[in-house]
Amino acid sequence: MGVPKKYALVSGTGEADTSLAAFDAALIDAGIGDCNLVELSSILPPNAEEDDLPEFPPGSIVPAVVAKAVGRGLVSSCICVGRLESGLGIVSERAATDSVETVRRLAKRDVEEMARLRGEKLVEVRTVTASTEPEDAEWAAAVAAVVFWG
């Protein structure tokens, strides 16, 4: 696999009577429910451009950094992308049975610390979040992701 040229920030929520089905519903809501996601760590290529999520053929192998929270109460997730002066991007994923404000704050703090460890300054910070709690089912899920392709 080469260096991805494009990425999209996506999020979704779902609920169901099982934890797995709630997670599946959240992936569907985020537009990536029919993909085989390959988990990545926390680096956004320097020249990657943000774009709208394409329609991947069902079963596509798609690289992504994913934050997922699944539970029987409030669940929240956040992806935070920080762009450094060098152009490199760093990604933090946070998920918890807590408020969206809490996971966003923690994800931003992660990115600030990751920049500090590299001796660089952040020039841009973007977040995508999801938060929900079950209303009509036993389980809820919140997913936030940065998806790569190209």
UniProtKB/Swiss-Prot annotation:
Belongs to the PdaD family. Binds 1 pyruvoyl group covalently per subunit. The keyword Lyase applies. The record marks 41-42 as: Cleavage (non-hydrolytic). Its cofactor is pyruvate. It comes from the Archaea. The modification Pyruvic acid (Ser) is found at residue 42. It comes from Methanopyrus kandleri (strain AV19 / DSM 6324 / JCM 9639 / NBRC 100938). GO terms for biological process: arginine catabolic process. It catalyses: L-arginine + H(+) = agmatine + CO2. GO terms for molecular function: arginine decarboxylase activity. InterPro entries: Pyr-dep_his/arg-deCO2ase, Pyr-dep_his/arg-deCO2ase_sand, Pyruvoyl-dep_arg_deCO2ase. Keywords: Decarboxylase, Lyase, Pyruvate. This is Pyruvoyl-dependent arginine decarboxylase. HAMAP family: PvlArgDC (MF_01404). Its EC number is 4.1.1.19.
